[in-house]
């Protein structure tokens, strides 16, 4: 399960998406996420699905990596579907005691589950096609106009970058500790939920110690390199908008406009 969590991992490549400006990718992702919540009909969801599959194809990221990113959240997806299945009023398809399944419940549950799948796929695509350093530069550039209002743009971007970088590291550390505990007879797979939660305590304690140790080592390394924040810092590669960014914007805006049109006509 831990090896299936891919948040923060970068997939090297030279695709159209890899070469887009990180600012453009972040903005396009935010616009497309908004477009997902505009979708309400079968045809609008079909359009979103087709555009997302086309984006994945253009990115060069294997579809199995997107599926791998979705797998750890299967419980949330199933729970979302069940909640809407049993709580949405409408045309009754099945009724037995407290179980009341409606046609609208099935449709609503499917749509809400698809929205979550789309959100996971989009966030995964962003991190797969953008290295942590480039993503940090993009976030910092987008936050820079807010510095006049006292927003610490560089510090926030650096925190996000470190957090994304540490996720795979901590997952690897967790997996290593669990294997070490299992070799000593620990069981993490059997028993009820409470038993499994208690069995994780021997994992959490060394994990927290390891996390604090790594954080201290990182702070020491940054101080040794005279890190003093973003003031006066220069970058090896300057961010620059290109024609491919305009194409990306145009495609996302066009799909969003179509979804708004479908919503207004439905």
Question: Which positions does each model-derived feature cover?
Answer:
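Transmembrane alpha-helix interface motif
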Residues: 1-44, 48-57, 141-151, 155-158, ...
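Membrane-helix interfacial "entry" motifs
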Residues: 14, 37, 60-65, 96, ...
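Alpha-helical transmembrane segments and their helix-start/interface "positive-inside/aromatic belt" motifs
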Residues: 25, 64-74, 248
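Transmembrane helix-loop junctions in multipass membrane proteins, especially transporters and channels
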Residues: 41, 45, 60-64, 88-96, ...
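Alpha-helical transmembrane segments and their membrane-interface exit regions
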Residues: 51-61, 76-79
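Loop-to-transmembrane-helix entry motif
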Residues: 69-73, 77, 113, 117, ...
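Juxtamembrane/interface alpha-helical elements of multi-pass membrane proteins
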Residues: 73-186
